[in-house]
């Protein structure tokens, strides 16, 4: 007998009603059995296929003629009647079909002379495919076939997939809405956003509509994708609709979180194997390193007080997170004993956990040591007695010293003062030929700590106890400063709006709106040092029209207030986005009409002002290191002012830079030499200025849209650059390209940029309004930097010599020119 399990090819068409596929051919085979039994005639043909949905009734008819007795089998097992199976003549009925009823059925007709068998294939399956768009390759479809004579209005075929109406997803995720439906004739589907027709040009990157799956797919969602999405399914007999609500949540910036208790302490014998496991949870892509604490010249710490470290394992281009989270140590020796640290960092900060490895002697060596237990016990007792004696002597000496030098608190004032020097970092120029920024830990300010002698408070109870030296040139009376509403939180504390009476010396009785930086309630000594350092930096830099200027400070008789200029129109990125025309990509509200109409000259003027501000900072030997539209503020008179240039950043420990408050990764604004070599110069600021120009002429667009960070490193190394914005002239775009030259020395200076922009601004008239209704061009890495010879994988810009290792902080690995952040 032929084995049907090997030669039956089934084509199953999903249907709502029972359908029958007729055989296309038949083959008759006579088989001679034992002489005493009548010959059996098998009707071996392609089985008839019956398809039914779960719960439906199934009826199969045996088409054999002249059948005296008909018997039924399923998968070779005799089939008898029961509460769901009914056998009536040549008919087999199955009530309430289930997937278990699927299989190969056969009916055999027994006659006096011979017998004949007929086969059927039954398939009980859902009419609706369960495949998502991720499984499109399986060919499953959500279409439902209808009897051509049964006309029907649209209806939902799988409401379970539509129950979740509210979708809240993090930014950059993919969102899919589904509306599985049926009807006759087959209905059509269209999508609305906020009640209006949803078109491809309404979002950057467009969207996908999978009609065979009744789905809408949006990749890399952004906050502007928030809203109500309605699917409308209709044919000539009716229309139905269903609405989803999408909420895009900005990612919460947080340094990596390490699972408690991991890595765990471990012990093994010499020659054994051991592994440490470190579980890292991070929203932003983390960079993970395994570090071992080592000794040099018998010491675990260097002259600077930092421990000696050795990097054992770091993430590379082809390393997965699961691989880097496990550290294997094979064939352990005594030298492997010690402290091991799992260090993880992202753009927000770093976290680390440590564990100890104890190495025990091998069983053979242990016997040698235990051969003379008397000597070992004697040594232990001697050491113990010696330590106890030392402790007793130390306690006696301390008590004698305290007794002879105990101060008389009753004769002293209630408050004492202790002068504490806090080292403040500032930028200096190494030489006339180099504009790289270095560190100087020279104490700039002496800060006096107030100590209470009548309470058992710790010596440094809080930064609110500190007294700063008064600077008459900048000191401003507290009683003339009225604090207002909060404006936000910065690197060192919070910023509030305030009214300062008489801060403008030309108008001593007039109140001026200012911004005040202050520490938070839980601020640390380092936060105070950072804020004082920023204030001192702003004092040294001086004033300019296109930077945020220091107006004064309140340092006496209260918390530290740093008073700076107030910019009423917020940061430049949001300022530009708010002035986009309706319908433009990234537009948060397509129905909103912008308050002001931007002209081409406005954008050139904005760029020119920022170039002047950076030219001034460069002349003052100040390197910004985070130049971007988010760090530019706009005043009421549309004057551009560069902010955050006075932050005291430690450039030697810049591996993990703080993420900005709006969640953007600074690496997209960083020059290659800053990204890979940690070299920050005025030329690296010029690179960032080119990205800032791109932001301006795209009215607040996000650089390298849709490009992952790892892919960005590769593209920059190969010489790719962003395309020209749709509303930017070739001359301005070539200026951007010059700023993005791979060789820092080939980039223009800020002085040259000011001269070029001044010329362009002079030739530009106010009548040159921008046609911003056209969509912005998509970024495509198809424009390599053909003018630069520094795009090869072996170029020194992207494959630098390793820099001296710095303890406690992860290093960027130069593996194939890629860095994991």
Curated annotation (Swiss-Prot):
Residues 131-144 have a biased composition (Acidic residues). Its main location: membrane. Residues 481-770 form the Protein kinase domain. GO terms for biological process: angiogenesis; animal organ morphogenesis; apoptotic process; axonogenesis; bone development; bone mineralization; bone morphogenesis; branch elongation involved in salivary gland morphogenesis. Changing residue 526 to E: In FSPC; constitutive kinase activity. Its EC number is 2.7.10.1. Residues 22-377 are extracellular. GO terms for cellular component: cell cortex; cell surface; cytoplasm; cytoplasmic vesicle; excitatory synapse; extracellular region; Golgi apparatus; membrane. Autophosphorylated. Binding of FGF family members together with heparan sulfate proteoglycan or heparin promotes receptor dimerization and autophosphorylation on several tyrosine residues. Autophosphorylation occurs in trans between the two FGFR molecules present in the dimer. Phosphorylation at Tyr-769 is essential for interaction with PLCG1. N-glycosylated in the endoplasmic reticulum. The N-glycan chains undergo further maturation to an Endo H-resistant form in the Golgi apparatus. Changing residue 315 to S: In a non-syndromic craniosynostosis patient with abnormal intrauterine history; confers predisposition to craniosynostosis. Coiled coil: none annotated. Residues 161-178 are annotated as: Heparin-binding. It is a single-pass type I membrane protein. Changing residue 342 to R: In CS, JWS, PS and ABS2. The second and third Ig-like domains directly interact with fibroblast growth factors (FGF) and heparan sulfate proteoglycans. Alternative splicing events affecting the third Ig-like domain are crucial for ligand selectivity. Tyrosine-protein kinase that acts as a cell-surface receptor for fibroblast growth factors and plays an essential role in the regulation of cell proliferation, differentiation, migration and apoptosis, and in the regulation of embryonic development. Required for normal embryonic patterning, trophoblast function, limb bud development, lung morphogenesis, osteogenesis and skin development. Plays an essential role in the regulation of osteoblast differentiation, proliferation and apoptosis, and is required for normal skeleton development. This is Fibroblast growth factor receptor 2. It comes from Homo sapiens. The gene is FGFR2.
């Amino acid at each position: 007998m032929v084995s049907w399990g090997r030669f039956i090819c089934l084509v199953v068409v999903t249907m709502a009603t029972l359908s029958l596929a007729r055989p296309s051919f038949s083959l008759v085979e006579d088989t001679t059995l034992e002489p005493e039994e009548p010959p059996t005639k098998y009707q071996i043909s392609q089985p008839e296929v019956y398809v039914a949905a779960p719960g439906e009734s199934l009826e199969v008819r045996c088409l054999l003629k002249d059948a005296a007795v008909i018997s039924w089998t399923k998968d070779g097992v005799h089939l008898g009647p029961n509460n769901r199976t009914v056998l009536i003549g040549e008919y087999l009925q199955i009530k309430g079909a289930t997937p278990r009823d699927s299989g190969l059925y056969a009916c055999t007709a027994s006659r006096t002379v011979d017998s004949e068998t007929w086969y059927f294939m039954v398939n009980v399956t859902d009419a609706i495919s369960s495949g998502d768009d991720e499984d499109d390759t399986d060919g499953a479809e959500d279409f439902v076939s209808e009897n051509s004579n049964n006309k029907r209005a649209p209806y939902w075929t799988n409401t379970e997939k539509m129950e979740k109406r509210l979708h809240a997803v993090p930014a950059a995720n993919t969102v899919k809405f589904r509306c599985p439906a049926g009807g006759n004739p087959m209905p059509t589907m269209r999508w609305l956003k906020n009640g209006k027709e949803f078109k491809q040009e309404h979002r950057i990157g467009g969207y996908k509509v999978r009609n065979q799956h009744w789905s809408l797919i949006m990749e890399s969602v952004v906050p502007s994708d928030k809203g109500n999405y309605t699917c409308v399914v209709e044919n000539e007999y009716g229309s139905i609709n269903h609405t989803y609500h999408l909420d895009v949540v900005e990612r919460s910036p947080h340094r990596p979180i390490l699972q408690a208790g991991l890595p765990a302490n471990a012990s093994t014998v010499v020659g054994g194997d051991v592994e440490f496991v470190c579980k890292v949870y991070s929203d932003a892509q983390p960079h993970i390193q395994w570090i071992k604490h080592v000794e040099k010249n018998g010491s675990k710490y260097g002259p600077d007080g930092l421990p000696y470290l050795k990097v054992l394992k770091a993430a590379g281009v082809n390393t997965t997170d699961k691989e880097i989270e496990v550290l294997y140590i094979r064939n352990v020796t005594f030298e492997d004993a010690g402290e091991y640290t799992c260090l993880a960092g992202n753009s927000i900060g770093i976290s680390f956990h440590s564990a100890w490895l104890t190495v025990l002697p091998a069983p053979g060596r242990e016997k040698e040591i235990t051969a003379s237990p008397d000597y070992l016990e004697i040594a232990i007792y001697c050491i113990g007695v010696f330590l106890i004696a030392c402790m007793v002597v130390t306690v006696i000496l301390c008590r004698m010293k305290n007794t002879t030098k105990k101060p008389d608190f009753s004769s002293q004032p209630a408050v004492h003062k202790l002068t504490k020097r806090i080292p403040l970092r500032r930028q200096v120029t190494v030489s006339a030929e180099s504009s790289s920024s270095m560190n100087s830990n020279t104490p700039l300010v002496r800060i006096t700590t107030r100590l209470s002698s009548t309470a058992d408070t710790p010596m440094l109870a809080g930064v609110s106890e500190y007294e700063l030296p008064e600077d008459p040139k900048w000191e401003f009376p507290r009683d003339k400063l009225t604090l207002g509403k909060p404006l936000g939180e910065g690197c060192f504390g919070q910023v509030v709006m305030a009214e300062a009476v008489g801060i403008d010396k030309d108008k001593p009785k007039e109140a001026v709106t200012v911004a005040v930086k202050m520490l938070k309630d839980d601020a640390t000594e380092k936060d105070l040092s950072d804020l004082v350092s920023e204030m001192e930096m702003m004092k040294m830099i001086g004033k300019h029209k296109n930077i945020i200027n220091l107006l004064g400070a309140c340092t006496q008789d209260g918390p530290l207030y740093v008073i700076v200029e107030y910019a009423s129109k917020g940061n430049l990125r949001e300022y530009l986005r708010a002035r986009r025309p309706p319908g433009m990509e990234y537009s948060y509200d397509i129905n909103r009409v912008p308050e002001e109409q931007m002209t081409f000259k406005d954008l050139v003027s904005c760029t020119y002002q920022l170039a002047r501000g950076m030219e001034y900072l460069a002349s003052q030997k100040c390197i910004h290191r985070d130049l971007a539209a988010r760090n530019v503020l706009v005043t009421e008179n549309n004057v551009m002012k560069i902010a955050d240039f006075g932050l005291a950043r430690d450039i030697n420990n810049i591996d993990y830079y703080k993420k900005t408050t709006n969640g953007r990764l600074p690496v997209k604004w960083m020059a290659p030499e800053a990204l890979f070599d940690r070299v920050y110069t005025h030329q690296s600021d010029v690179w960032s200025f080119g990205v800032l120009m791109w932001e301006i002429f795209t009215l607040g667009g996000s650089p390298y849209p849709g490009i992952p960070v790892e892919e960005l490193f590769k593209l920059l190394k190969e010489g790719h650059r962003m395309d020209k914005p749709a509303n930017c002239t070739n001359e301005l775009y070539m200026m951007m390209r010059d700023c993005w030259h791979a060789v820092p020395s080939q980039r223009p200076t800020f002085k040259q940029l000011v001269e070029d922009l001044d010329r362009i601004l002079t030739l530009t008239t106010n009548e040159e309004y921008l046609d911003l209704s056209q969509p912005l061009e998509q970024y495509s890495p198809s424009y390599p930097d053909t003018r630069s010879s520094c795009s090869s994988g072996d170029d020194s810009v992207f494959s630098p010599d390793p820099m001296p290792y710095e303890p406690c902080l992860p290093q960027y690995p130069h593996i194939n020119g890629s860095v994991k952040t």
